[in-house]
């Protein structure tokens, strides 16, 4: 055994051995209980960052721990490889997105291997590979057959300068991120997945996800947004048109004095009178440049325009003006709102602004509301007035009665509405999965026959940054023979939203080389659900919801038996670091600040707050440099020790150095005692300091096991091992009890193995074991060793600590009380005082009350 801890040499040695032995390969036919551990796979940006290190270190602890416990662990890794960054890089660096992506994958794979993560690399997938996306295309075709995929018109972000559709994240301050042109809403034909067919099941099944954080479940429930109410038909005056309105407040129907429609409503232009046309068109053009999220925020300026048309309130025949309003969206309800200004604050403000009449229809029992003097809407419960036969009813009771009345009259119906909208999956992008559809002038929309899959993404394209998808200009790809009639036809040039790839990758990992379909039914049913999924909470209502939807769809397509993809979910916190800046050079990298000065100009650097590590603010740490300086085990240890997994981690160099010193200390403890403990065993009976050390060893085993298993309290688990190492260094009876010292050192190595596997494998071998740590398994604690002969009791006088005493663990309260009254340093606080009461808390403390 070398005297000094050489992190680089040790880590290289064990990583090579693990790869040669395929140590982490999951076995298909295995009697052991399965455990599927998965972290959200990364986009291959080119380099891993400290967020990756933390996320994957958390997962690796669990995977290694479960493997040591005897589970057959599946722990795969792959690449969410399609997406816009590759196209942007292609434009910037004049390279092909595929070349850029695969080079990045190679680089990041090497980085992950340097971290020593226990991945089964035989199961690696890249979603940009045809052998992955061919099966995604097949799933789409099956969904099309079932009516779960369809095409319709939808509004998208459109840059008129670039002549292309922009994703939401490409819209910055209402403008195109590339050219600065104001973005508008444009109606295009898009493909959709009918996730709304599963809205109720997705909502109901959140109750089954007891292993998920409640905030994630709450976000999903709110996103699905189930509400019960009425759909009401409002006839348009002097026409045959009807406007459908969804409301949860049918109790206020008699108070509707105007209607608000989304600017994108399909009837918007049909409702416009000649005299209002110019103003309405200008309004619609303006609204289409406004961010949808901002339009509904409370502080956004509410605007509207009168269409020149009137609706008819179906319960009282009142003519009410129809407005277009910027705060109404097509994304909720029907895109049309019956506006009751006296009982909705937004409608109240709008009515005051545009001088629209108001009618009170709900008021408190002891008060009469007057619209002329009201300063805000009345939104509390009350009694109906001005509501014909329903006057006098409390408004909650009136909801049911008015709903029944609407159904009787044939002008409305009780219904359930969801905030959730069908998932638009079309992207006018090149670097994505081609949608397997052919357009034929004679046959219309024709699915690509299954035997012709995959529809390959052509690689001989030039990414120029010009408007539109390059696929639309690629004649060999575009022109095709119709499989139905044999005539000339063209391919769909849209590609799938990249969230489609990540909605089923966890299933493909179970059988990544299966060639007869997306998944092998028996294999996927064995491995799913994922026992532990780990990733960021920012994916709560996109990826995590879509993955649940896809699982249910694949179940209904007969591809798997499971209802849910992920049994347990851990959402880890961010990695944060102080920012630093210079008046001359702006944001600075950490290495550009030395002794508080900018190394570029010598100016005093300004230190900012701790923020999420980001390239833009340069508060980043390069994992490669960290590994080079300290080793992968130190990087892993700090990322696990500095904060609980679900909390944000604040980076500091001193903490990293402390973890590095700790590993040196563990190494030294084994090195210094190796010769003495060689070949010895724990004696049958021990006492004194040896018994205390054994007790701490087994208490630590018990604590670390509980902290890892299910709770993920890695920081406290590591802290308890650090305390054990301190006890090892303080064990003065090691020459008398070398077997106890050996047990303590071996326990330390085994307990640290999931956290810092390289150094622990090396130390385990140094301790004379040939089988490796996995062969040894996870240590079990001995309950007998935990039994205490003595306890240390704190003694207080009038609530202040005045001494401690050591007493037999089984001493009764009288014995403890008498010993406390005679304890050193306690007696002097009792002199001249009267003892009024003695309170004994068994096993912990004695409080003597005197006066």
From Swiss-Prot:
Subcellular location field: Cytoplasm
Binding site for ATP: 615
SUPFAM superfamilies listed in its UniProt record: Anticodon-binding domain of a subclass of class I aminoacyl-tRNA synthetases (SSF47323), Nucleotidylyl transferase (SSF52374), ValRS/IleRS/LeuRS editing domain (SSF50677)
Transmembrane portions of the chain: none
PROSITE patterns: AA_TRNA_LIGASE_I
UniProt EC number: 6.1.1.4
Motif 'HIGH' region mapped to chain: 42-52
Catalytic activity: tRNA(Leu) + L-leucine + ATP = L-leucyl-tRNA(Leu) + AMP + diphosphate
HAMAP family: Leu_tRNA_synth_B
Protein name as annotated: Leucine--tRNA ligase
Organism for this UniProt entry: Syntrophotalea carbinolica (strain DSM 2380 / NBRC 103641 / GraBd1) (Pelobacter carbinolicus)
Gene: leuS
């Amino acid at each position: 055994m070398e005297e000094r801890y050489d992190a680089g040499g040790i880590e290289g040695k064990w990583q090579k051995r693990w790869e040669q032995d395929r140590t982490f390969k999951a076995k298909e036919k295995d009697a052991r209980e399965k455990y599927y551990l998965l972290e959200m796979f990364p986009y291959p940006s080119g380099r891993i960052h400290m967020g990756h290190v933390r996320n994957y270190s958390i997962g690796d602890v669990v995977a290694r721990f479960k493997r040591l416990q005897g589970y057959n662990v599946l722990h795969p890794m792959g690449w969410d490889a399609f997406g816009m960054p590759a196209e942007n890089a292609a434009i910037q660096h004049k390279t092909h997105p595929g070349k850029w992506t695969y080079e990045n994958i190679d680089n990041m794979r090497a980085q992950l291997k340097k971290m020593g993560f226990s991945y089964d690399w035989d199961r690696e997938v890249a979603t940009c590979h045809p052998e992955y996306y061919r099966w995604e295309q097949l799933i789409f075709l099956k969904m099309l057959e079932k009516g779960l995929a369809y095409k319709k018109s939808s509004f998208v972000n459109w840059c008129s300068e670039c002549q292309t559709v922009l994703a939401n994240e490409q819209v910055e301050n209402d403008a195109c991120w590339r050219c600065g042109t104001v973005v508008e809403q444009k109606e295009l034909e898009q493909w959709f997945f009918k996730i709304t067919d599963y809205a109720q099941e997705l909502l109901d099944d959140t109750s089954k996800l007891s292993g998920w954080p409640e905030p994630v479940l709450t976000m999903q429930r709110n996103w699905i947004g189930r509400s019960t109410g009425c759909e009401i038909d409002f006839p348009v005056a002097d026409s045959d048109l009807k406007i459908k309105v969804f409301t949860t407040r049918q109790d206020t129907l008699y108070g509707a004095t105007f209607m608000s429609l989304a600017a994108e409503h399909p009837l918007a232009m049909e409702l416009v009178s000649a005299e209002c046309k110019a103003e309405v068109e200008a309004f619609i053009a303006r609204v289409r440049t406004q961010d949808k999220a901002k339009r509904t925020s409370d502080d956004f300026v509410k605007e509207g325009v009168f269409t020149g048309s009137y609706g008819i309130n179906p319960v009282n025949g009142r003519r009410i003006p129809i407005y277009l309003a910027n705060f109404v969206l097509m994304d909720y309800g029907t895109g049309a709102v019956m506006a009751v200004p006296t009982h909705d604050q937004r409608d109240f403000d709008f009515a005051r602004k545009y001088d629209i009449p108001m009618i009170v229809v709900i008021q408190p029992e002891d008060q009469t509301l007057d619209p002329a003097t009201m300063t805000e809407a009345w939104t509390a419960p009350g009694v109906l007035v001005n509501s014909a036969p329903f006057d006098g009813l409390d408004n909650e009771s009136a909801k049911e009665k008015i709903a029944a009345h609407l159904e009787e009259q044939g002008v409305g119906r009780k219904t359930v509405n969801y905030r959730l909208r069908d998932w638009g999956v079309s992207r006018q992008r090149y670097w994505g999965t081609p949608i397997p559809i052919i357009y034929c002038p004679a046959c219309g929309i024709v699915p690509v026959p299954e035997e012709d899959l995959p529809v390959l993404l052509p690689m001989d394209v030039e990414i120029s940054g010009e408007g539109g998808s390059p696929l639309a200009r690629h004649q060999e790809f575009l022109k095709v023979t119709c499989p139905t009639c044999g005539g000339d036809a063209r391919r769909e040039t849209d590609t799938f939203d990249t969230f489609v790839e990540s909605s089923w990758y966890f299933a493909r990992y179970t059988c990544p080389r299966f060639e007869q379909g997306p998944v092998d039914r028996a294999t996927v049913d064995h491995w799913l659900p994922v026992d532990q999924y780990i990733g960021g909470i920012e994916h709560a209502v996109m990826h995590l919801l879509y993955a649940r939807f896809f699982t249910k769809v694949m179940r209904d397509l007969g591809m798997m038996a499971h209802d849910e993809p992920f049994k347990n979910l851990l959402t880890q916190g961010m990695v944060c670091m102080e920012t630093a800046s210079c008046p001359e050079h702006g944001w600075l990298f950490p290495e550009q600040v030395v002794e508080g000065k900018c190394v570029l100009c010598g100016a005093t650097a300004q230190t900012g707050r701790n923020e999420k590590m980001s390239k833009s603010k340069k508060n980043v740490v390069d994992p490669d440099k960290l590994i080079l300086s300290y080793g992968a085990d130190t990087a892993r240890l700090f990322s696990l020790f500095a904060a609980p997994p679900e909390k944000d981690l604040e980076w500091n160099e001193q903490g990293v150095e402390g973890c590095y010193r700790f590993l040196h200390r563990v190494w030294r403890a084994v090195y210094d005692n190796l010769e003495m403990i060689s070949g010895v065993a724990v004696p049958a009976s021990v006492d004194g300091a040896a018994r205390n050390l054994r007790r701490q060893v087994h208490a630590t085993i018990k604590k670390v096991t509980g902290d890892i298993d299910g709770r993920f309290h890695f920081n406290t688990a590591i802290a308890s091992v650090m305390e054990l190492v301190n006890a090892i260094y303080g064990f003065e009876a090691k020459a008398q009890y070398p077997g106890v010292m050996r047990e303590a050192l071996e326990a330390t190595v085994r307990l640290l193995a999931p956290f810092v596997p390289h150094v622990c494998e090396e130390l385990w071998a140094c301790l004379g074991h040939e089988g490796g740590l996995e062969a040894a398994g996870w240590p079990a604690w001995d309950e007998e060793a935990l039994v205490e002969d003595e306890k240390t009791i704190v003694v207080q006088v009038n609530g202040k600590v005045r001494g401690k005493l050591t007493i037999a663990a089984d001493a009764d309260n009288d014995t403890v009380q008498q010993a406390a009254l005679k304890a050193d340093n306690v007696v002097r606080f009792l002199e001249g005082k009267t003892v009024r009461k003695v309170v004994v808390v068994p096993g912990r403390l004695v409080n003597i009350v005197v006066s």
